[in-house]
């Protein structure tokens, strides 16, 4: 298990590389060029700037999250080939900087969805919150205004250029069925996987968050069967998944440890986080500690150890604690606590295995 930490870049993140360097066991940053619109090539010079900044703090930049997929590709429009070619060129540029994994998603219009970025919790901290009834009754424009109200930081997946054409996008997706979206993903993967393979880069799709349709838009990476289908679209080790325990775990029917065991060799990157589910479909982000939420974090880490996981993992969304002023879900303190909790489980399992091996001799 190789621990990494998401960093949004100098001037775009309240957390410094110097502070991340002080978290035990973190070896690299998970990064992106957030100002480059989907469909444009990432300049090699900009990529190398990030690499240089990271290496000054002894970090690698092996994992990128995300290289966003242009909506024309998801819609299957004739213009998609131009954007796919740009995506291929970005893959080649990233390979020159030593990148090994590209996390991306194939969610129409919206990336992750929450209704409250600062939900007050019982302990006085705040966290990301999803209220199902509000989403069911909300006009999509209202959701955009909720997310856009955070003026301090850019919000990945909620870029202004994407949301400015919201009405047009919704009209375009009226004609896209779930099977159409699968076909468009298949087309995309057939084009980019050979390039990624040649560049020794793994493509790792992120599950839909939350894992069910919203506003009538199709969502296709939501459960065990979907993931199995995804991996067979282009059945090659380069075609993988970013296994996110929080996104998949929002659906109580998803058994993440079982997914880890079945798909182990196709998981180059993992997000581990905890959420507390409610019977009405709501959920709230919690600390990583298993008892604080509904996700079986201990069994998840044990499953990764059991399969000999050597991929990258990062703590995911944390609470906002100790009056930290930070990007929603991405402060320093709670994610650092999460890392130490994950290491504690991992080390405990590893030491237990070592003792078992010694006594068995």
Curated annotation (Swiss-Prot):
UniProt keyword list: Iron, Lyase, Manganese
Keyword 4Fe-4S: no
GO biological process terms held by the UniProt record: D-glucuronate catabolic process
GO molecular function list: ferrous iron binding; manganese ion binding; mannonate dehydratase activity
Signal peptide stretch: none
Record-linked Pfam families: UxuA (PF03786)
Protein name: Mannonate dehydratase 1
Functional description taken from the UniProt entry: Catalyzes the dehydration of D-mannonate.
Gene behind this protein: uxuA1
């Amino acid at each position: 298990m190789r621990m990494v930490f998401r960093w949004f870049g100098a001037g775009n993140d309240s957390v410094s590389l110097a502070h991340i360097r002080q978290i035990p066991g973190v070896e690299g940053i998970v990064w992106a060029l957030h100002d480059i619109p989907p469909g444009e090539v990432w300049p090699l010079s900009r990529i190398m700037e990030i690499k240089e900044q990271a290496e000054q703090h002894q970090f690698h930049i092996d994992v990128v999250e995300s290289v966003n997929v242009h909506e024309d590709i998801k819609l299957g429009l004739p213009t998609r080939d131009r954007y796919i070619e740009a995506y291929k060129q970005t893959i080649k540029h990233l390979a020159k900087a030593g990148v090994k994994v590209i996390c991306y998603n194939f969610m129409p219009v919206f990336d992750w969805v929450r209704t409250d970025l600062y939900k007050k919790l019982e302990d006085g901290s705040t966290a990301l919150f999803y209220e199902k009834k509000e989403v069911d009754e909300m006009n999509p424009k209202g959701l955009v205004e909720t997310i856009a109200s955070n003026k301090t930081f850019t919000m990945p997946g909620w870029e202004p250029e994407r949301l400015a054409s919201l009405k047009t996008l919704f009209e375009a997706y009226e004609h896209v069925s779930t099977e159409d979206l699968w076909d468009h993903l298949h087309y995309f993967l057939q084009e980019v996987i050979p390039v990624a393979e040649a560049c020794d880069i793994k493509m790792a799709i992120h599950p839909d968050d939350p894992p069910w349709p919203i506003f009538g838009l199709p969502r296709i990476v939501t459960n065990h069967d979907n993931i199995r289908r995804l991996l067979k679209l282009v059945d090659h080790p380069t075609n993988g998944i970013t296994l996110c325990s929080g996104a998949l775990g929002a659906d109580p029917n998803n058994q993440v440890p079982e997914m880890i065991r079945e798909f182990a060799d196709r998981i180059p990157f993992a997000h581990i986080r905890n959420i507390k589910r409610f019977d009405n479909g709501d959920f709230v982000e919690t600390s990583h500690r298993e008892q604080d939420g509904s996700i079986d974090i201990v069994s998840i880490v044990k499953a990764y150890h059991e399969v000999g996981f050597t991929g990258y993992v990062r703590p995911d969304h944390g609470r906002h604690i100790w009056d930290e002023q930070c990007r929603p879900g991405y402060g320093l303190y709670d994610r650092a606590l999460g890392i130490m909790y994950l290491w504690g489980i991992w080390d405990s399992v590893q030491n237990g295995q070592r003792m078992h091996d010694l006594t068995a001799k």
